[in-house]
């Protein structure tokens, strides 16, 4: 049986954690970092890059680099690369595959299962799509868990048995959640949750980009948004400036050769952004966090003074303005500083994986559905069957009837949201229940049952009590993927994994070959007088052979040429060693003859005295 991990699949960065001896450990990736950028790039040579390597080449490969894909999950978004369309699930799966690979390299065994976290305010389609991404990556998704709940689990279990109320303020790269939880005696219960799926650190970055674009246009009359490479450089500079402003009062943004003017003269961008100005241009974004906060306090039916701990989650909470606002909203309470906002969610996910696998005992996680669920009834009204903040898993039934005489069927339209008019909410899916016996309106009894599983995924059943006819739907319409499509993507991902592995190995062979040729040329140059012309010619010919094979695609030919060069290089090394050994013997003889010279002996004595003085001085 393979291992289970906890994964925080973030908009900007992702993290993977595992239980080792019952304790959660955050796993460093192959580059040595504990966070992996959620960036995927398709290099022009066909290689798929994920993480830091993808982020590093974004400026020169703008159209083939995808970032912040989490903002598109659960929609019909796709991106075309080399005449192939990739869905948000497939791009997310690439990130998950890297995390899985890195975890397997660390553990030395296969990773089969995962708990993946999502923002608490994610809708059904977004949860379903996240689960599909895990399946495409070759993972059995044990559970989809809300990020604030995972954070509270990681934070709360260290606090012992005492019951306490925890507020989790989670501002990530692309989403915002605030949740209120009660923890005590091994039970983590969510009281209320609210949020904004379109608010995150990316929006703060974009404000800096807009500010820079405006400044540059007023100075030079050139709109940098028309230049994709310049825009990518601005995005990267904006992110760095935002991070810098969390620690200092000013950030200098200097981008040489950002573009050229009409006469092809290079233009530079050089601006200073103060923290005060940054807070001014992003104030409305900050204000948007207040409504969900107040909603949660109201839904939970508590006062701010009853909150025991405040936990900040997500890298964006490092911004001083965010910390100050949270203190203000919670009546001056200092947020907990003992939690790493980038890692705490993955740690909680690993703990939940341990709970589900039976490795962690006496822990019960009671999550809630973030939005109300219901169906459209006569007049376009939203009739709610399950109210928001209901603990899941849950099941609710309600009986409806027909609106017309002799109505043969009913159309069940399932919505998620808080608006009173159904069409103003999110349509999750629809299905038809036919075969209703002819009867006056109001007579047939149609029982509609909503069943939400522990992942927050919705199943709806409609049953005619008179005929016993029944129809069921598992809401999948939002993700837009059938099981056949998911299976195809899984096979595609597996094929690509093998292909990527082969391509990586081939690239390593090429890199090693290039390095060997360079080192050989350098070695020949440095030891020019110590090797015969015949041997030198053989080595140079072998090096040329490697260079020629590198121009082609035949990897076996490169290996053969490298083996030949290694053989000739060893011969050259042996010849140089023998030449130096012979020269050393000659010098030793000369040294013995000169040992009788008194002047030389005096010089040695002086050197020894000096070094002894130095030693004494050092002491």
Swiss-Prot record:
Residues bearing the modification Phosphothreonine: 175
Region named Disordered: 582-619
Pfam family, one: HSP70
The entry's keywords: ATP-binding, Chaperone, Nucleotide-binding, Phosphoprotein, Stress response
Keyword Phosphoprotein attached: yes
GO molecular function: ATP binding; ATP-dependent protein folding chaperone; unfolded protein binding
Low complexity: bias regions: 582-594
SUPFAM superfamilies according to UniProt: Actin-like ATPase domain, Heat shock protein 70kD (HSP70), C-terminal subdomain, Heat shock protein 70kD (HSP70), peptide-binding domain
Role played: Acts as a chaperone.
PANTHER family for this protein: HEAT SHOCK PROTEIN 70KDA
Protein name: Chaperone protein DnaK
Organism: Corynebacterium efficiens (strain DSM 44549 / YS-314 / AJ 12310 / JCM 11189 / NBRC 100395)
């Amino acid at each position: 049986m393979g291992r289970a991990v906890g994964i925080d699949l973030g908009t900007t960065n992702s993290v993977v954690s595992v239980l080792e001896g019952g304790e959660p450990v955050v796993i460093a990736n192959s580059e040595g970092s504990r966070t992996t950028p959620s960036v995927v790039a398709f290099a022009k040579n066909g290689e798929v890059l994920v993480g830091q390597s993808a982020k590093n080449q974004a400026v020169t490969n703008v159209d083939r680099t995808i970032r912040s894909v989490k903002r598109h999950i659960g929609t019909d978004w796709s991106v075309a690369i080399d005449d192939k369309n990739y869905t948000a699930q497939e791009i997310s799966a690439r990130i998950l595959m890297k995390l899985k690979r890195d975890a397997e390299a660390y553990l030395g065994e296969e990773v089969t299962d995962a708990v993946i976290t999502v923002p608490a305010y994610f809708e059904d389609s977004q949860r379903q799509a996240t689960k599909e991404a895990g399946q495409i990556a070759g993972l059995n998704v044990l559970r989809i868990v809300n990020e604030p709940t995972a954070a509270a689990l990681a934070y709360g279990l260290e606090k012992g048995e005492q019951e306490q109320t925890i507020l989790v303020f989670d501002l990530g790269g692309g989403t915002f959640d605030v949740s209120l939880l009660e923890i005590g005696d091994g039970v983590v219960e969510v009281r209320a949750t609210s949020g904004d799926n379109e608010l995150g650190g990316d929006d703060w970055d974009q404000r800096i980009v807009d500010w820079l674009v405006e400044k540059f246009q007023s100075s030079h009359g050139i709109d940098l948004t028309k230049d994709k490479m310049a825009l990518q450089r601005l995005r990267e500079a904006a992110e760095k400036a935002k991070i810098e402003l969390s620690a200092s009062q000013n950030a200098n943004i200097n981008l040489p050769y950002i573009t050229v003017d009409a006469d092809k003269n290079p233009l530079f961008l050089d601006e200073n952004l103060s923290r005060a100005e940054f807070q001014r241009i992003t104030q409305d974004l900050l204000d948007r966090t207040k409504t969900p906060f107040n909603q949660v306090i109201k839904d939970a039916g508590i006062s701010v003074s009853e909150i025991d701990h405040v936990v900040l989650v997500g890298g964006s909470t490092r911004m001083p303005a965010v910390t100050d606002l949270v203190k203000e909203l919670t009546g001056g309470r200092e947020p907990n500083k003992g939690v790493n906002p980038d890692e705490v969610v993955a740690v909680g996910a690993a703990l939940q994986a341990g709970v589900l696998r039976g490795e962690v005992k006496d822990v019960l996680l009671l999550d809630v559905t973030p939005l109300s669920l219901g169906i459209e009834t006569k007049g376009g009204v939203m009739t709610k069957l399950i109210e928001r903040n209901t603990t899941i898993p849950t099941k609710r039934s309600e009986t409806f009837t027909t609106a017309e005489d002799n109505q043969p069927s009913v159309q069940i339209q399932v919505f998620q949201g808080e608006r009173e008019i159904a069409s103003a909410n999110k349509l999750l899916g629809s299905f038809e229940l036919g075969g209703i016996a002819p009867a006056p309106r109001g007579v047939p009894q149609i029982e509609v049952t909503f069943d939400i599983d522990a992942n927050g995924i919705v199943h709806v059943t409609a049953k005619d009590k008179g005929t016993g006819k029944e129809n069921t739907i598992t809401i999948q319409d939002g993700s837009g993927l059938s099981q056949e499509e998911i299976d195809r993507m899984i096979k595609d991902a597996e094929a690509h994994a093998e292909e990527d592995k082969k391509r990586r190995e081939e690239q390593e062979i090429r890199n090693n070959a290039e390095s060997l040729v360079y080192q050989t040329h350098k070695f020949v140059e440095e030891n020019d007088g110590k090797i015969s012309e015949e041997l030198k010619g053989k080595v140079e010919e072998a090096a040329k052979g490697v260079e020629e094979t590198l121009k082609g695609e035949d990897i076996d030919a490169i290996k053969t040429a490298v083996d030949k060069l290694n053989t000739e290089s060893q011969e050259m090394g042996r010849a140089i060693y023998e030449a130096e050994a012979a020269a050393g013997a000659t010098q030793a003889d000369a040294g013995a003859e000169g040992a009788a010279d008194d002047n030389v002996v005096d010089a040695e004595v002086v050197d020894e005295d000096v070094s002894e003085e130095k030693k004494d001085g050092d002491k």
